[in-house]
C-alpha cells in the first residue's frame, strides 16, 4: 500500500455529458430530468477519478454537490461491473453516513439513478426502525446497494450471513470526520474488514482531521485528493454571506425575534446548543404575538425517528418557516430553498460551524448566515477567520422590542413554559461549561445572570456547578410576588395530574410525620424500660441480688 501523500489535481468545469470517461446515457437523461446540466467543481474533479477506478479523498465545502459526486460514479461502476446484473443478495456497493437523516436523503437522491439499473435493489439501513423489519426486507427482497448508518449496517452484516460482499465494487464514507467524531470507529473498521480490498473507495468530508487521514491511509490505495475551492480564501460556499451579531446575553432573545420578523417570508434554520433549548424556544417563539404568522418546526437527537422525519418533511414542503434544531441537522441535509442560517448558540465543536452554515447557499445559490456572540466571545471571529471562514459584523437592531416580559408572562400563565425554560437554561449552562473552545467561551466569564434574564427565567434555579465554582449572577432580577407552586399548566389534564400528585405527596408527608411521632413515643418507652433494667442491675441492688442467689444455691446444696 502506498502511504505517500495523495496528488492534488484540478480541472475545468464541464457539462455532465462532457465528462471523461463518459457517463452512460441513462444517467445523463436522469440528470436532465432533475435539472442538472453543468458540474460543480467537486463533481468535475471527483467523478472522473472514481470512474477511472481511483480512490479519492475529497475535501469539499458543505453544499458543494458532493452527494452526486459519489452517487454518479457509484451507479456507473456497478453498471460496468463484471458481476452486473447481480444476484438478489449480492452486495455491490455500500454508502456509510453518520446520521439517519443524511442516509435517508442519500437514498432518496439515489433513487432516480438506481432506477436506471434493471434488477438492482437499494436498501436503507438506519436506526430508529425495527430490526426485524430490516432483516425481513433483506431476506425477501435482497440488497445490492446498502445505504445507512454504521451501527445498523454493521449489525445487519453480522446477522445476515447470506449477504455476499465478495464482489463488492465500491465503498463510500460520507462525512468521514463526523463518522469518527461520533464514535463509529469500531463499526466502520468492522464494515471495512468485511469488504474485499480490491474495490474503489471514496472518502468525503468538509473538514480533514488526523483521524480522517489515518483512515485514508488504512482504507484507501493510491488515493487522489480533491480539494474543492482550494484557491478560495473562504472555506464556505462562494454564495454565502456570513455575519456575527455581538449582543448581551439578555438581549439575544429580543434580537432573534426581531431577525425572525424581518425574514418572516423566508426559510430559516436556527441552531441551539441542546435538545432542551430546542424544545423550549420552539414552545416560546410560537406563542409570541408578533411571530404568530410564522410556522415553527423542531428536530433534535432525543426526538423519536418518526417525529424527526415528520418535522423535516413538513419544513421541506413549506414555502417559508423556521426549523429549530441541534447539530442533528448540521450535516448533509439538503433542504431546498433555505435562505438564512442562524446560530443562536455557537457550536461546541468549531468544525461544526462550517456544516451548520452549509445548510444555505448550496449548489452555487445565494444564502446568509449569522452567529450570535456575547461580548466576551468575540475572539471567535478571529478564530474563524484563521480557519478561512470570514465573518462580517452586523449591528444590534435598536428597533428590537424587549421580549423578556412577554416570555416571563408566558411562564407565569403556563407551568409547561416555566419548566421547559428552567430545563433549557440549566442544560445550556452545563453544556457551556464543557465547550471545546473554552479559552474563547470561558465558563468563568459567562454572565449567567444576564443569560437567565434572556431565557425569561422567573427565579434563579439551584445549579451545583454555579455554586461550586462561585459564578456570580449579576444582572438577574427575579420576579416578585409569585408562588411557584400556584403556577398551573394550561393543559387541563396535566394540571389535574399535578394536583393529584401534590395531594399524594402531602398525604405521604403527613403519614411519615405520624409514623415518626409513633415511633418516637415507642422508642421513648423502650428506652425508659432499658434504662430501668440497667438501673436494677447496677450498684448495691446488683450485689444484694447476687448475694441472695448465692445463699439460695448454698441452701439447696445443704
UniProtKB/Swiss-Prot annotation:
UniProt feature, compositional bias: Basic and acidic residues: 521-530
Positions of region (Disordered): 506-558
GO molecular function, one term: ATP hydrolysis activity
Key words, A-Z: ATP-binding, Helicase, Hydrolase, Nucleotide-binding, RNA-binding
Residue positions of motif DEAD box: 174-177
Start and end residues of each Helicase ATP-binding domain: 47-226
Gene behind the chain: RH49
Entry text on domains: The Q motif is unique to and characteristic of the DEAD box family of RNA helicases and controls ATP binding and hydrolysis.
Listed Acidic residues bias regions: 549-558
Domain Helicase C-terminal: 255-402
EC number: 3.6.4.13
Binding sites annotated in the UniProt record for ATP: 60-67
Name of the protein: DEAD-box ATP-dependent RNA helicase 49
Record Pfam families: CTE_SPB4, DEAD, Helicase_C
Motif (Q motif): 16-44
Domain of life the protein comes from: Eukaryota
InterPro entries reported for this sequence: DEAD/DEAH_box_helicase_dom (IPR011545), Helicase_ATP-bd (IPR014001), Helicase_C-like (IPR001650), P-loop_NTPase (IPR027417), RNA-helicase_DEAD-box_CS (IPR000629), RNA_helicase_DEAD_Q_motif (IPR014014), SPB4-like_CTE (IPR025313)
